[in-house]
C-alpha cells in the first residue's frame, strides 16, 4: 500500500521511493534511516541541500574534485573553485575541501589552473583566465573557515607562483599591465573568461582586454595574498598590498556619472 506523496517501483527486488516529506520512506533499511537522521537544530532545507551537494563531490585519482554537472560535464577549474565554499566549507567538509585544493594544485601550469579535464583522459586544457583567481579566493575562504595555516603554508608556493606568472605574463597574453596594474587577457580566436562560447573558430563574445569581473578577482587575489602574509605564512616575493592599491586606483579611474558606475 502506497502512502500519499510516495511513488514506488519494484524491479528485480530493488525498491525506489520518492517523496517531498523529510522522513525517509518506510522501505529504507533502519540503518540508512539512522545514518540520514539530521541534528535536531538543523532546518530540513539545510539537510536537503547537504544531500544534494553530495552528488557533485567525486574522486580524481587519490584526491577529490567537483563535477560541474551531470551528465556530460567533468570537473572544471572555475566551477570547482566557485562552488567549494558552499559544497565543502558551509557543510564542514573541511578534509574534502583541503583535498580538492591540493588535488588541483598539482595541475597548475605557468600560474594557470586547468579550465577543465577532458573526458577522454587527455591533457588538461588551460584556456581560462579566472580559474586561478578563483583558486586564491577559495584558499582565502578555507583559511577563514578553518584557520588551517599548515595547509596554507603548504600551498603558499603555488599561490605565489600563480601571482608571479600573472605579473610577468603567461598564456593568451594574460599579464598585469605595467602602466596601471590591471590584468589584461585574451588574444584573437580565444575566449578565456566565463563567456567562452564559440561557433567553430568564431568567438561569440570577444573580450580581449581588461574585463571588469576579471580585474575584481585580480584585485581580490592580491589582497588575499596580503592577508595571508600578515599571518606570517612566509616571506612574500612581492608587496601585494601595494600592487592591490595600484590596481584598485586604476579600476576606479573611470566613472560614468550618467549610469552611476
Where in this protein do the model-derived segments appear?
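Acidic, mature catalytic/reactive cores of soluble proteins
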Residues: 1-261
Amino acid at each position: 500500500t502506497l502512502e500519499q506523496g510516495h511513488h514506488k517501483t519494484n524491479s528485480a527486488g530493488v525498491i525506489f521511493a520518492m517523496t517531498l516529506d523529510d522522513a525517509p520512506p518506510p522501505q529504507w533499511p533502519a540503518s540508512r534511516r539512522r545514518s540520514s537522521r539530521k541534528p535536531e537544530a538543523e532546518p530540513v532545507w539545510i539537510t536537503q541541500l547537504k544531500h544534494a551537494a553530495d552528488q557533485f563531490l567525486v574522486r580524481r585519482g587519490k584526491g577529490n574534485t567537483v563535477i560541474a554537472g551531470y551528465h556530460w560535464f567533468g570537473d572544471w577549474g572555475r566551477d570547482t573553485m566557485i562552488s567549494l565554499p558552499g559544497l565543502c566549507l558551509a557543510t564542514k567538509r573541511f578534509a574534502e575541501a583541503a583535498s580538492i585544493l591540493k588535488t588541483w594544485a598539482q595541475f597548475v601550469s605557468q600560474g594557470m589552473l586547468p579550465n577543465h579535464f577532458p573526458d577522454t583522459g587527455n591533457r588538461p586544457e588551460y584556456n581560462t583566465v579566472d580559474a586561478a583567481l578563483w583558486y586564491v579566493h577559495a584558499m582565502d575562504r578555507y583559511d577563514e573557515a578553518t584557520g588551517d595555516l599548515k595547509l596554507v603554508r603548504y600551498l603558499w608556493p603555488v599561490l605565489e607562483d600563480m601571482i608571479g606568472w600573472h605579473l610577468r605574463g603567461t598564456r593568451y597574453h594574460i599579464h598585469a599591465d605595467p602602466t596601471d596594474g590591471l590584468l589584461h587577457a585574451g588574444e584573437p580566436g580565444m575566449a578565456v573568461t566565463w563567456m567562452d562560447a564559440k561557433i567553430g573558430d568564431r568567438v561569440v563574445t570577444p573580450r580581449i582586454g581588461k574585463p571588469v569581473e576579471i580585474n575584481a578577482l585580480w584585485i581580490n587575489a592580491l589582497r588575499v595574498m596580503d592577508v595571508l602574509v600578515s599571518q606570517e605564512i612566509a616571506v612574500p616575493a612581492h608587496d601585494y598590498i601595494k600592487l592591490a592599491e595600484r590596481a584598485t586606483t586604476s579600476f576606479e579611474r573611470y566613472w560614468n556619472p550618467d549610469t552611476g558606475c
